[in-house]
Amino acid sequence: MTTNYIFVTGGVVSSLGKGIAAASLAAILEARGLNVTIMKLDPYINVDPGTMSPIQHGEVFVTEDGAETDLDLGHYERFIRTRMTRRNNFTTGRIYSEVLRKERRGDYLGATVQVIPHITNAIKERILAGGEGHDVVLVEIGGTVGDIESLPFLEAIRQMAVEVGREHTMFMHLTLVPYMAAAGEVKTKPTQHSVKELLSIGIQPDVLICRSDRAVPANERAKIALFCNVPEKAVISLKDVDSIYKIPGLLKSQGLDDYICKRFSLNCPEANLSEWEQVIYEEANPVGEVTIGMVGKYIELPDAYKSVIEALKHGGLKNRVTVNIKLIDSQDVETRGEELLKGLDAILIPGGFGYRGVEGKIATARYARENNIPYLGICLGMQVAMIEYARNVAGMENANSTEFVPDCKYPVVALITEWRDENGNVETRSEKSDLGGTMRLGAQQCQLSDDSLVRKLYGEPVITERHRHRYEVNNMLLKPIEAAGLRVAGRSGDDQLVEIIEVPNHPWFVACQFHPEFTSTPRDGHPLFAGFVKAASEYQKRQAK
């Protein structure tokens, strides 16, 4: 089987939506019966985004095999059925570290190690490895054409087009076509200059995706085709839409998938986008709406919680309701109190690190518990729920986590020093371990209690969910907390770690150590988020009586 490669680049400005465009195209090709995957190549020097600030980079998306990756991989998994792995994302930092390790080992036999050929060869090797077994691989190059950081990646894909063959490679370039209100027309010159920059590197784009706030007129697309040396049918208008799930249909309506299949000589049936049409219908025709408060510490950049926000929307789709998300800074809860939490139909506390804002999250968990408001805690959201219950119900005054107060009297949450990874191997950590790549990461099995709410929601006794944490419930202090009424609803596969807790005498209070948002998709949803949004709707109805 021959693998075909589509290299996706961006020009003029950043944040054009290369990831969404690539994922949408992949969704159409998958709907034609092709085996598709997507890769993201990031030009920064960090080995991975694991230690980067969420406010700078956005969320860290965790794959099944425990890789900490770019948030675009979350988009990929929400659009196609293929699960991402550590092969689907790598950075300049990882490439350089591998090449330097080989140099120290003597693998280059005394050669002068250079960007070309050693770095570019390493990039090509990773792309080829990630594409094995697939009909089509979309490779998104992070950054903007013209950035110095992206040059090794662009040179590598230029070489791949020669080595793999132009009949099995395509270059798709996203560019901005701005509308100038004063002139009353869109302007194509930025696109022309962006393509000129790409040509200077030796890359002739085969497809141009023209991003604009409106449809690009046919005469302007013809102009772009003429000056950029691209067939007119390969100049695609991609206007702003109110739902990203409309983009596959928008690309298909302009024949992009037909053009690609013809170019690669792929004989496959027409794309069936009925599942996406159903998603769009459910999104556009809700029968109600709920307001869910999300209390976190990175709310100035919603992308820090991208998968959680999308998962809540998916939960809304499964219940035919619109989910309005109110982002609340946990530090504001500390200073202003409960007034910020009034009027909510449900409360969610997502993951996070560090002491800042933690007391506000603990106060939020208490407010939800005492006022019978549906509550979903994720990762740190479970830990603060445990701390709150220990303090205010189990009588453990000033209970805390050793992450925040290392010498607290009741460390109900503590560092995990030993656990098994996704392959069953024993992992060990200490307070002196590096921060990067040292957490409990990836898919882990969880056993659900027969009498629990989550057992009913999932409908099966054993589930698999993805983790990203280094602190856990301290089993040494668990018995008195359980005696005070808290239910452990899920444990790790080896029965050693607490994975899910519930408050039994509460309408809906669930907190989990894992990250269910990473496996939620618009077509399938997720049991926890569907149940959470349903509970919010029921709470709203009770309040209205």
UniProtKB/Swiss-Prot annotation:
Protein's name according to its UniProt entry: CTP synthase
Task performed by this protein: Catalyzes the ATP-dependent amination of UTP to CTP with either L-glutamine or ammonia as the source of nitrogen. Regulates intracellular CTP levels through interactions with the four ribonucleotide triphosphates.
Catalytic residues in the record: 379 (nucleophile), 515, 517
Associated pathway: Pyrimidine metabolism; CTP biosynthesis via de novo pathway; CTP from UDP: step 2/2
Species per Swiss-Prot/TrEMBL record: Cronobacter sakazakii (strain ATCC BAA-894) (Enterobacter sakazakii)
InterPro entries, A to Z: Class_I_gatase-like, CTP_synthase, CTP_synthase_N, GATASE, GATase1_CTP_Synthase, P-loop_NTPase
Annotated region (Amidoligase domain), positions in chain: 1-266
Binding positions (L-glutamine): 352, 380-383, 403, 470
Matching Gene3D superfamilies: 3.40.50.880, P-loop containing nucleotide triphosphate hydrolases
UniProt keyword Signal, yes or no: no
Enzyme Commission numbers on file: 6.3.4.2
The entry's keywords: ATP-binding, Glutamine amidotransferase, Ligase, Magnesium, Metal-binding, Nucleotide-binding, Pyrimidine biosynthesis
Catalysed reactions, semicolon-separated: UTP + L-glutamine + ATP + H2O = CTP + L-glutamate + ADP + phosphate + 2 H(+); L-glutamine + H2O = L-glutamate + NH4(+); UTP + NH4(+) + ATP = CTP + ADP + phosphate + 2 H(+)
Annotated Mg(2+) binding sites: 72, 140
Recorded GO CC terms: cytosol
Note: CTPSs have evolved a hybrid strategy for distinguishing between UTP and CTP. The overlapping regions of the product feedback inhibitory and substrate sites recognize a common feature in both compounds, the triphosphate moiety. To differentiate isosteric substrate and product pyrimidine rings, an additional pocket far from the expected kinase/ligase catalytic site, specifically recognizes the cytosine and ribose portions of the product inhibitor.
All residue ranges annotated as the Glutamine amidotransferase type-1 domain in the record: 291-542
Binding site for ATP: 15-20, 72, 239-241
GN (gene name): pyrG
Subunit structure: Homotetramer.
GO BP annotations, alphabetical order: 'de novo' CTP biosynthetic process; pyrimidine nucleobase biosynthetic process
Activity control summary: Allosterically activated by GTP, when glutamine is the substrate; GTP has no effect on the reaction when ammonia is the substrate. The allosteric effector GTP functions by stabilizing the protein conformation that binds the tetrahedral intermediate(s) formed during glutamine hydrolysis. Inhibited by the product CTP, via allosteric rather than competitive inhibition.
Record SUPFAM superfamilies: Class I glutamine amidotransferase-like (SSF52317), P-loop containing nucleoside triphosphate hydrolases (SSF52540)
Binding site for UTP: 14, 187-192, 223
GO molecular function: ATP binding; CTP synthase activity; glutaminase activity; identical protein binding; metal ion binding
